[in-house]
């Protein structure tokens, strides 16, 4: 990993008036030029982290580092970060130009340079020609662009975004996701984005921190977190999931619903109780006799791109299926899936334990592969003789 631009070392936050611990020993490192997302429900602590980076809140314990320098005691205006708030925090009595130029005027930048830089950033956010437009006459999406332009005009090392898209309608929010991601990649600035919207996080991020109750419960790429949730909370919070109790018989073999299935996971104890996750889109509808499982369709909703089908197996387990194929309520269908569609979660495993287990398991597999290669090479030499 490159030298981190931002680092949290054992950071906690307690609100003394209520004695509420909203952050619990947070540790992470952020690289320069990436798009990070803090994802969690309301009250998970994600906005608290953002406010501590910005200097709007003090950490109770721990160190906050920016480029290797401790910044706990450095005031907000001296930190090379800029925040875009959910409310945008624009000045209603100023036009677009004056709002965007405001940070430069505080630094007493030359008038000609201000005009040049404002024109550049307004072009970046597709607001050319809006310089004299009143803030009050802008749409929600246009106000969002003004707030982003103001955030990047000083070319900060880090831009913090606190649920900036939540007030927009669905179509505009989706458009802004593309625009924000493209802008971040073009500028090469580190973005730290806060949201409770899982699809938003998956679509935009290089790296996601999933938060719950003041803790980071899992971090990783969007694909890693979606495909390999570490626990029940992550599996249900990130997308839809079918979760069932199971037993890991041995490496690559799991039992659930009274049957044994091939899997791709390993590194657990023989006959260890686990939770089995299968995503709704990974289930394929077949004839009952051709399916690995048989279920009875209970309800069906059309979601536009697919049907969302709820069905129950003979043990009473509920199954959600996403399919482009329409089912009939009351009919029995088969469900088929591949070994790689089965995700295994160890009970009560932390992210540190998960990473250590996977690392140890990979090392063992590599050693076994090396031993097999050595034996094969030895046989080849013997055959030559």
Curated annotation (Swiss-Prot):
Subcellular location, record wording: Cell membrane
GO cellular component, as recorded: ATP-binding cassette (ABC) transporter complex
An MF annotation (GO) of this entry: ABC-type polyamine transporter activity
Gene3D superfamilies linked to this entry: 2.40.50.100, P-loop containing nucleotide triphosphate hydrolases (3.40.50.300)
Residues that, per the record, bind ATP: 40-47
Catalytic activity, EC: 7.6.2.11
Catalytic activities: ATP + H2O + polyamine-[polyamine-binding protein]Side 1 = ADP + phosphate + polyamineSide 2 + [polyamine-binding protein]Side 1
Family the entry assigns: Belongs to the ABC transporter superfamily. Spermidine/putrescine importer (TC 3.A.1.11.1) family.
Assembly notes: The complex is composed of two ATP-binding proteins (PotA), two transmembrane proteins (PotB and PotC) and a solute-binding protein (PotD).
Function: Part of the ABC transporter complex PotABCD involved in spermidine/putrescine import. Responsible for energy coupling to the transport system.
Protein name according to UniProt: Spermidine/putrescine import ATP-binding protein PotA
UniProt organism field: Streptococcus pneumoniae serotype 4 (strain ATCC BAA-334 / TIGR4)
Gene: potA
């Amino acid at each position: 990993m490159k030298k981190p631009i931002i680092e949290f070392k054992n950071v906690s936050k307690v609100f003394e008036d209520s004695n509420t611990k909203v952050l619990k020993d947070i540790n992470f490192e952020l690289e320069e030029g990436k798009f990070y997302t803090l994802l969690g429900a309301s009250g998970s602590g994600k906005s608290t982290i953002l406010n501590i980076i910005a200097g709007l809140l003090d950490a109770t314990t721990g160190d906050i580092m920016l480029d290797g320098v401790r910044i706990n005691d450095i005031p907000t205006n001296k930190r090379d970060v800029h925040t875009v708030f959910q409310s945008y925090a624009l000045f209603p009595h100023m036009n677009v130009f004056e709002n965007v130029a405001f940070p430069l005027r505080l630094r007493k930048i030359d008038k000609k340079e201000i005009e040049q830089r404002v024109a550049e950033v307004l072009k970046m956010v597709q607001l050319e020609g809006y310089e004299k437009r009143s803030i009050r006459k802008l749409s929600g999406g246009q106000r969002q662009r003004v707030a982003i332009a103001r955030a990047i005009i000083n070319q900060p090392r880090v831009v913090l975004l606190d649920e900036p898209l939540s007030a927009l309608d669905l179509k505009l929010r989706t458009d802004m996701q593309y625009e924000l991601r493209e802008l971040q990649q073009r500028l090469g600035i580190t973005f730290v984005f806060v949201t409770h919207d899982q699809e938003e996080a998956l679509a935009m991020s290089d790296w996601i921190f999933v938060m719950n109750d003041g803790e980071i419960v899992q971090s990783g790429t969007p694909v890693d977190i979606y495909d390999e949730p570490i626990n029940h909370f992550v599996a249900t919070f990130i997308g839809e999931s079918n979760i069932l109790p199971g037993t890991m018989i041995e490496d690559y073999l799991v039992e659930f619903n009274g049957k044994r299935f091939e899997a791709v996971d390993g590194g657990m104890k023989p006959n260890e109780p686990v939770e089995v996750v299968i995503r709704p889109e990974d289930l394929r509808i077949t004839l009952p006799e051709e399916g690995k499982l048989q279920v009875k369709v209970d309800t069906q909703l059309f979601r536009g791109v697919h049907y969302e089908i709820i069905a129950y197996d003979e043990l009473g387990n509920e199954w959600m299926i996403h399919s482009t194929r329409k089912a009939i309520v009351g009919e029995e269908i088969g469900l088929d899936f591949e070994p790689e569609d089965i995700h295994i979660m160890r009970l009560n495993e932390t992210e540190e334990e998960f990473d250590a287990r996977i690392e140890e398991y990979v090392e063992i597999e590599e050693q076994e592969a090396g031993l097999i290669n050595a034996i094969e090479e030895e046989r080849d030499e013997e055959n030559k003789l």
